[in-house]
C-alpha cells in the first residue's frame, strides 16, 4: 500500500471511529493540548516538590503515600488539601480510619468549613463516593485515608476470625479500573494513604509490603515512601517535631527514586522555612560556618531554629531565598524543552 493510500485509509478509519464513538475519541497526541500540560498541587515541602520533578502532585492521576505509623502520611496529605484550597480548589477527605483531627487540619492551613468529609461504613461505599465525587468534575483533590481501613462489606458483615482471602485486593482492583479514567477526564487528583505490613518468611530482600494488593501500585502515577528518621529537639531538650525522609518510589512523570528531607513540627506541620534553609545551604545560597548562617553580608542567626524563626518573621527574605533556589534548580537542569520548536514539535539545534 502506497503512502497516499495509507493516509486515506487512516483518515477513513478515524472518521468511522468519531462517527461511532463521538468527536474527540481519537486524535493526534501533539494536537491534544492537555497532553503537554500537567497541573500540580504543591505538597508544602519545597524539597519534595523538587524531588517529584513537576513541582507537586499531579492532577488527574492517582498518588499513593505509604509508610510506617507516625511518619507524617496524614500531615502530608492534609498539606496538599490546604494548598489545593489556597489555589481556589475544592477538596474532599474520605476518612475511613475515623481519625482526622479537625483542629490539627486547621492548624496546618486547611479550611475545615469548606473541606468535604465522609466517614463511610465499608470500603465499597468509600470507593463509590470517591468515584462519584471525581465524576462530578467539581473536586480538585480527594484523599482516601487509608487503604488498610477500607473493609469489604462481606468482611464487615461476617464474624471476627473469618478468612477472606484476597477480598480487599479484588475490591481495590475493580474500583481503580473505573476511577483511573474518571480522574483523568475530570483532572482530579486522588491520594491514597497506605500502611505497610511485613511479609512472613522473607529471608532476602525487602520484607515490607503495602495493603490492598498490587492494583494500587500499578495504577498510581506517583508512589511516595515517607519515613521518620529522627526527632527535632527544642528548649529543655523536648521534642518539637520529627525529621522526615521521603523517597519517590515510583514516578511516571519525572525520574523516580529521588529523595527529599524536611521537618514536621508538632505545632505547625511541615516547616516550609526549614525546607528553604536546607536547600539554600545545599546550593550555597546561604553560607553556613559552624553554627552561624549567613546570607550575603547579613547574619541570619546562630543555630537552625534561630534562622527558622527569622524566615518566619521576614517573609520578604523567605520569598527571595525561594526564588533563588528555583533559579539554581532551573540552571542546573538540562534545558530539553528549550531545544524543541513550539510549533513543529521538532528538536532544534541547541543554542550555543
From Swiss-Prot:
GO terms for molecular function: ATP binding; ATP hydrolysis activity; ATP-dependent DNA damage sensor activity; damaged DNA binding; single-stranded DNA binding. Changing residue 334 to A: In strain: L2. Keywords: ATP-binding, Cytoplasm, DNA damage, DNA recombination, DNA repair, DNA-binding, Nucleotide-binding, SOS response. GO terms for cellular component: cytoplasm. It is found in: Cytoplasm. The keyword Cell membrane does not apply. InterPro entries: AAA+_ATPase, DNA_recomb/repair_RecA, DNA_recomb/repair_RecA_CS, P-loop_NTPase, RecA-like_C, RecA-like_N, RecA_ATP-bd, RecA_C_sf. Belongs to the RecA family. This is Protein RecA. It comes from Chlamydia trachomatis serovar D (strain ATCC VR-885 / DSM 19411 / UW-3/Cx).
Amino acid at each position: 500500500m502506497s503512502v497516499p493510500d495509507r493516509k486515506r485509509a487512516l483518515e477513513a478509519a478515524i472518521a468511522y471511529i468519531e462517527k461511532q464513538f463521538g468527536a474527540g475519541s481519537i486524535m493526534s497526541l501533539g494536537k491534544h493540548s492537555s497532553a503537554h500540560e500537567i497541573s500540580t498541587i504543591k505538597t508544602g515541602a519545597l524539597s519534595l516538590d523538587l524531588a517529584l520533578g513537576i513541582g507537586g502532585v499531579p492532577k488527574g492521576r492517582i498518588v499513593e503515600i505509604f509508610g510506617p505509623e507516625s511518619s507524617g502520611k496524614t500531615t502530608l496529605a492534609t498539606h496538599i488539601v490546604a494548598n489545593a484550597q489556597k489555589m481556589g480548589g475544592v477538596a474532599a477527605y474520605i476518612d475511613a480510619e475515623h481519625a482526622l483531627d479537625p483542629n490539627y487540619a486547621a492548624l496546618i492551613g486547611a479550611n475545615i468549613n469548606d473541606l468535604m468529609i465522609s466517614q463511610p461504613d465499608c470500603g465499597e461505599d468509600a470507593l463509590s463516593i470517591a468515584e462519584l465525587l471525581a465524576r462530578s468534575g467539581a473536586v480538585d483533590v480527594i484523599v482516601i485515608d487509608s487503604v488498610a481501613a477500607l473493609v469489604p462489606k462481606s468482611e464487615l458483615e461476617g464474624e471476627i476470625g473469618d478468612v477472606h482471602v484476597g477480598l480487599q485486593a479484588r475490591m481495590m482492583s475493580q474500583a481503580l479500573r473505573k476511577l483511573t479514567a474518571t480522574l483523568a477526564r475530570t483532572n482530579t487528583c486522588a491520594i491514597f494513604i497506605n500502611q505497610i505490613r511485613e511479609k512472613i518468611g522473607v529471608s532476602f530482600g525487602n520484607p515490607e509490603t503495602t495493603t490492598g494488593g498490587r492494583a494500587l501500585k500499578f495504577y498510581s502515577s506517583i508512589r511516595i515512601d515517607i519515613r521518620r528518621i529522627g526527632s527535632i529537639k527544642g528548649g529543655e531538650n523536648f521534642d518539637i517535631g520529627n525529621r522526615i525522609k521521603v523517597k519517590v518510589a515510583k514516578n511516571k512523570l519525572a525520574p523516580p527514586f529521588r529523595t527529599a528531607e524536611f521537618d514536621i513540627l508538632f505545632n505547625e506541620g511541615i516547616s516550609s522555612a526549614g525546607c528553604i534553609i536546607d536547600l539554600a545551604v545545599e546550593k550555597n545560597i546561604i553560607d553556613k560556618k559552624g553554627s552561624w548562617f549567613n546570607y550575603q553580608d547579613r547574619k541570619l542567626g546562630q543555630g537552625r531554629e534561630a534562622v527558622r524563626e527569622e524566615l518566619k518573621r521576614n517573609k520578604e527574605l523567605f520569598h527571595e531565598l525561594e526564588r533563588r533556589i528555583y533559579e539554581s534548580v532551573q540552571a542546573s537542569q538540562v534545558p530539553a524543552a528549550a531545544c524543541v520548536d513550539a510549533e513543529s514539535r521538532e528538536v532544534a539545534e541547541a543554542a550555543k
